[in-house]
């Protein structure tokens, strides 16, 4: 049987864990105006307009990804196409000759270079294209079909924490994911004691809602990891290898007791976040809901990226970055361990107080600068670059592997290893954690027990 720390230990330590996580962050500086763009940005950063897109030729960009040579691939939302760009150095102008159209159709929602391929998802399928060391693209291969979902369908792809597979996130219009295995018992029901208030937008929507799927690089062994989101357009892993999902609100619910603001969820194994149509939504305090690490408020989540590869100050390299399409804001998300999970604080990293800034996607270039694109729904598109020009150290912080927080996460991972299958050791290992003061340890233990007969 796997070794595990007694649950009573975590109950004893939880108070100190929670208090330790309240340590203050560095001061939240007042934003300054960027002289080039007029945007408001954190001190020490400058913003460059790299390219104002000719929409008649290149469309309105909604997805982007960097290849191993530092080239940027972007996709129009409609039929203009998919393009590859040789970005010029800082201070030089992007010429139209640097933009080339790829034979890859259009309207890709998410793109990722990994495992010597370009992976892409659209509203009805996931595909990959081989990419040679010289940067040449081969023939497109469909990995699997996924039912149509439009702007609430399959969205984004990332590499798994062990570097061996991929995750796909999708919104609540997607059909049930084509999985062969699941970390969640697939016995979800929509029965209720009292009739629900039904209205308007997706009024008949049912579980599982939005979800995260794991699969091998060749598209096989698809496994449902977590679910219950509304419309999470993007997600990312932090430096601990933990998943965080940026989920949307339902703006028609504002003012209702079942309103759930845009928020960031910890995408744990077996996680159920309880999105249901209209008044059926689970509240975050329900014991069988994972809950959020931070609630943000009204907005429209789009791109997410970890700052790890950016040449940014240490504090910002540890952050995640969240794009809000509606409110012209790029947030930095600062995670602090709390038991076996986290809590978080969001700060405005960049915004445009003088006009629109419909952020659609974001990535870190090979040069260590941050790039984001603006567009969507046939709006005028732009490509911007964010550079750090200050004097603070940009060295990565040391990973925490020994604190009570790290040990609590290790205990949760042990419990999660029993998800999705029967194991004769599971009951003895998980049962003591049902009385833990740590919600996420209790949650992981319950899911482990639900899989045992």
What function would you assign to each model-found segment?
Residues 6-19:
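Bacterial N-terminal signal peptides
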Residues 396-399, 423-432, 453:
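Amphipathic alpha-helical scaffolding segments comprising HEAT/armadillo-like alpha-solenoid repeats
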